[in-house]
Amino acid sequence: MVNYLSLKNNISSNLFSGHNNINQEPICVGDYIRFGLLITEGTKERTQNCEGLVIAKRFSNTCCNLTVRTVFQGIGVERTISLFSPKISKIKILKHYKVRRAKLYYLRRKENVKKK
């Protein structure tokens, strides 16, 4: 008989073996984070630092997607990132806000939501 639990652990360890974001502190909705995004321009590769408030967190079988919102030049910008993507070089939690909702979509209607 096949041991499905060990098979599942083996597959998940192979899937996430190259990811550097796997062993870090947990990211929750309401965290103000800064993440480095690897961008390839021609033959050069550079890291673009972005920061914002996590307004949503979605799970699927093998990945976790975060929706990060920031205000840039008076315009709200949202970016959806995959937590275990190889394009994410680093993630740092700058501040944790205590929230009572799982999704903070109501912040889209607020005008001046900034880091306090």
Curated annotation (Swiss-Prot):
Transmembrane residue ranges: none
Any single GO BP term: translation
GO molecular function: structural constituent of ribosome
Keywords: Chloroplast, Plastid, Ribonucleoprotein, Ribosomal protein
Annotated Gene Ontology cellular component terms: chloroplast; mitochondrial large ribosomal subunit
Annotated localization: Plastid, Chloroplast
Family to which the UniProt record says this protein belongs: Belongs to the bacterial ribosomal protein bL19 family.
Protein name per the record: Large ribosomal subunit protein bL19c
Natural source organism: Cyanidium caldarium (Red alga)
Gene encoding the protein: rpl19
